[in-house]
Amino acid sequence: MLGGSVKSEVRASEPSPTCQDPETKAPHQDLPRPNQPAASGSVPSRPRRRPPPQRPHRCPDCPKAFSYPSKLATHRLAHGGTRPHPCPDCPKAFSYPSKLAAHRLTHSGARPHSCPHCPKAFGHRSKLAAHLWTHAPARPYPCPDCPKSFCYPSKLAAHRHTHHATDARPYPCPHCPKAFSFPSKLAAHRLCHDPPTAPSSQATGSHRCSSCNQAFGQRRLLLVHQRSHHQSEGQGERE
């Protein structure tokens, strides 16, 4: 009896060959016990990443997929042209309630997204995010022709037109041979050909001529009008 008990104690104290061999070690033996401190120099295991969400509901009109049939049904309204959410303040309608909510801010004038660096505020979060780049010291889009740099690729493209203004003028005037580098320059130039002739109560321009009551969108156009028209009238009267 005594020999059998001693043998059982020895067997219990000796580790099994399976535990000694790292290749045959069971997976649970690598896990630390609740009250056992981690070995020095050991790297704690990272938490497992969640698997990507299942999106079994695919749109037949585009590559997008959705988790729920209701999301797919809402998305397909954009393809069908259905706009079931009308604006109560204007004739516009929208496919999604979120688009309608964003649009209604234009009527209320609300600007809930304020800039933390300046007094400006914006109606949409995306507008604020784009504005914050103007405060950032980094301007990752340098001009290859001069030391200037810009926050946006569109600003760099518009600036580069100034270096090649004589070469690139893709916006011609339909009334004369002139052409311009920017649509805004063409729009300002076309006011010379088609000045507003409505009365002061209906004119859209804020700069009005005191002699003939014509209105202009820009002050320089008003000055051009006064020099070209009223100076010639004064010369005719003196003659």
From Swiss-Prot:
The Basic residues compositionally biased stretches are 46-57
Give the compositionally biased regions (Basic and acidic residues): 22-31
Domain of life, per the record? Eukaryota
Q: Which SUPFAM superfamilies match?
A: beta-beta-alpha zinc fingers
Tell me which residue ranges form C2H2-type zinc fingers. Answer: 57-79, 85-107, 113-135, 141-163, 171-193, 207-230
Query: Which InterPro entries is this protein grouped with?
Result: Znf_C2H2_sf, Znf_C2H2_type
Q: Which PANTHER family match?
A: ZINC FINGER AND SCAN DOMAIN-CONTAINING, ZINC FINGER PROTEIN 575
What species was this sequence derived from?
Answer: Mus musculus
Say where the protein is mainly found. Answer: nucleus
Q: Name one GO cellular component term.
A: nucleus
Alphabetized Pfam families for the sequence = zf-C2H2 (PF00096)
Q: Which family does it belong to?
A: Belongs to the krueppel C2H2-type zinc-finger protein family.
Protein's UniProt keywords contain Transmembrane helix: no
**Localization per Swiss-Prot or TrEMBL:** Nucleus
| Role | May be involved in transcriptional regulation.
> Which sequence ranges form a coiled-coil region, renumbered to this chain?
none
Protein name as annotated: Zinc finger protein 575
